[in-house]
């Protein structure tokens, strides 16, 4: 069976698995963005906390995904739970780093002007600092989206949803019928999903960034 025939024959399953993976990644990305922005907003004025947050992000990104998933499986068991926790954890790291950097590099004269107008700390954060840092934040979100789309494939090994199952199914019967087709379908499907997600996030970034600071 050719690769195209394999795709046509299993199109319903492949579409379902693609939708599963895309949904899982997007939901984890939304949760991670909220957590990362809140944490960054709490720590960005404290140099020690900023250093700790960026160091944690750097160290966290070095953790092998298989090792983290294995640890989570030991605690939560197989299934979607360890996959969601791992994806959310990895997604938080680039967003947290970028948000902290973005907030810390906002022009201090803008903050001083806002304070002179009598704005509260929270109002300055939401009306001045966060909008100015938003392009940097969204750059982190795009990095996280591409990264966890790939991690999501590995998460299928512990019972996570998505196209990773096709890859592992093909690898498990390497040399057998349709093994290569299965592996290629999963790999190319994930690459396509990552591209689609990045384009969507680019659109969201442009729509939510103030016109005056769009690049």
Question: Residues of each region from the PLM?
Answer:
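Generic alpha-helical transmembrane segments of integral inner-membrane proteins
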Residues: 22, 26, 30-38, 42, ...
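Cytoplasmic-entry segments and transmembrane alpha-helices of multi-pass inner-membrane transporters
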Residues: 39-72, 87, 95-101
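Loop-to-helix entry region at the N-terminal start of transmembrane alpha-helices
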Residues: 13-24, 73-94, 134, 182-186
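Short cytoplasmic-facing helical segments at TM-TM junctions of multi-pass membrane proteins
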Residues: 98-138
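Transmembrane alpha-helices
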Residues: 26, 89, 121-155, 185
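Periplasmic/extracellular loop-to-transmembrane helix junction in inner-membrane transport proteins
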Residues: 1-29, 169-172, 176-177
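Hydrophobic alpha-helical transmembrane segments of polytopic membrane proteins
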Residues: 163-204
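Short cytosolic juxtamembrane segments of multi-pass membrane proteins
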Residues: 205-215
